[in-house]
Amino acid sequence: MATHKTLLMCLGLPLFFPGALAQNHAPPGCSPDLDPLYYNLCDRSGAWGIVLEAVAGAGIITTFVLTIILVASLPFVQDTKKRSLLGTQVFFLLGTLGLFCLVFACVVKPDFSTCASRRFLFGVLFAICFSCLIAHTLSLNFLARKNHGPRGWVIFTVALLLTLVEVIINTEWLIITLVRGGGQVSTPGNGSADWTVTSPCAIANMDFVMALIYVMLLLLAAFLGAWPTLCGRFKRWRKHGVFVLLTTATSIAIWVVWIVMYTYGNKQHHSPTWDDPTLAIALAANAWTFVFFYVIPEVSQVTKPSPEQSYQGDMYPTRGVGYETILKEQTGQSMFVENKAFSMDEPASAKRPVSPYSGYNGQLLTSVYQPTEMALMHKGPSEGAYDVILPRATANSQVMGSANSTLRAEDMYMVQSHQVATPTKDGKISQDQSPKNKTRW
């Protein structure tokens, strides 16, 4: 008998060795000591896991950097209307970051924890993003019509309440589905019956999609709510409505594709192994749609001032008023229509900006002969004509029309010598009264 048992064991060992080797065999690119649950993250024969892992990792880094930029730009936001939306936009970025992280749960092989996180977080994270878009469109509708919208905490509360509805729905659905899938068993030694909980991976694809009806309604509401912002009176808010419209339209296309593939396409082609890649691709594609079509444009617009603030900056300049400012103001006055009847008598130099120091010729005032009234009163009536002291306009108009406003002593002497040579009405010749020969008082 012992000989027969030994012979059977020797014949049966080759039959069990291939199965044992197959269980311990690791795919190319993975370590033999690695848990088989994570083979898709390093399997080079099926590259979809590695590609999605790289795409999701890049998305996590990008979203994290954009979140830091958005929070750091808070002190530089001049428009109070845009500042009130920063809390909702940061909440949106956290939801997008969660979508990129959930891609890894869809890449690894299913077990109880990964399937539970997929079923619960898939709808909750999308509800966060779509609720923030709805709250943003609600604010944009007020801004596009009245140029003032709700306060920031009101917008954030709307997004938070819409998200909590999906949290409640998913929690109840997951509990009811898992308990309903189990059977009723009796506990030994106890008269009551207990309910066994089935695995969340056993949930049908159609049931999973039906649980996302509320999320689809949020997506549709965000898409329809973005259209009225394009018809508002204040046009500067239209571009924000365009950002939301592009994001929701692309998301609708992605959701239609992955739902058709998840519920119909994979069954028709008899490839249920593509269920997990379908969910992972949908998550990564929709998350990058949020980043490219909504987050990056909004971050680039958040620090731009409003037109009202730009107008106030032009009305009240902060720089000082100097000589350059005066010249600019004089140049700006040329845009008005002038009366040409008076502009003909003005010299051409008056049309150019004149420096305040252009009238100074470098001579001191002591060289100018200007007798005071007291000196004339003490001196008495002069022998000469009054036009010697107060010269009239003569042929020498070049002296009077010069840029200097005072007469020089040499010019006065030339006028007096000209009048001395002219006989007076009494037939006498006026004496040469040069300013140099007069006694000073």
Swiss-Prot record:
Transmembrane segment boundaries: 50-70, 85-105, 120-140, 155-175, 208-228, 241-261, 279-299
Q: What molecular functions are annotated in GO for this chain?
A: G protein-coupled receptor activity; protein kinase activator activity
Q: Kindly provide the name given to this protein in its UniProt entry.
A: G-protein coupled receptor family C group 5 member C
Q: Where is the signal peptide?
A: 1-22
Q: Which family does it belong to?
A: Belongs to the G-protein coupled receptor 3 family.
Database matches in PROSITE patterns: G_PROTEIN_RECEP_F3_4
Q: Which residues lie on this side of the membrane: Cytoplasmic?
A: 71-84, 141-154, 229-240, 300-441
The UniProt keywords, alphabetically, are: Cell membrane, G-protein coupled receptor, Glycoprotein, Membrane, Phosphoprotein, Receptor, Signal, Transducer, Transmembrane, Transmembrane helix
Instruction: Classify the main location.
Output: membrane
> Which residues lie within the region annotated Disordered?
419-441
Q: Which residues are glycosylated?
A: N190
Q: Where in the cell is it found?
A: Cell membrane
List Phosphoserine occurrences by residue.
S343, S382, S402, S405, S434
Q: What topology in the membrane does the UniProt record assign?
A: Multi-pass membrane protein
The domain of life for this entry's organism is Eukaryota
Where is the PTM Phosphothreonine found along the chain? T422
Mind telling me which CDD domains this protein's record contains?
A: 7tmC_RAIG3_GPRC5C
A single GO CC term for this protein reads: plasma membrane
The cysteines covalently paired via disulfide bonds are none
Task: List modified residues, type Phosphotyrosine.
Answer: Y413
Annotated Polar residues bias: 430-441
Query: Which residue intervals are topologically Extracellular?
Result: 23-49, 106-119, 176-207, 262-278
- Known role: This retinoic acid-inducible G-protein coupled receptor provide evidence for a possible interaction between retinoid and G-protein signaling pathways.
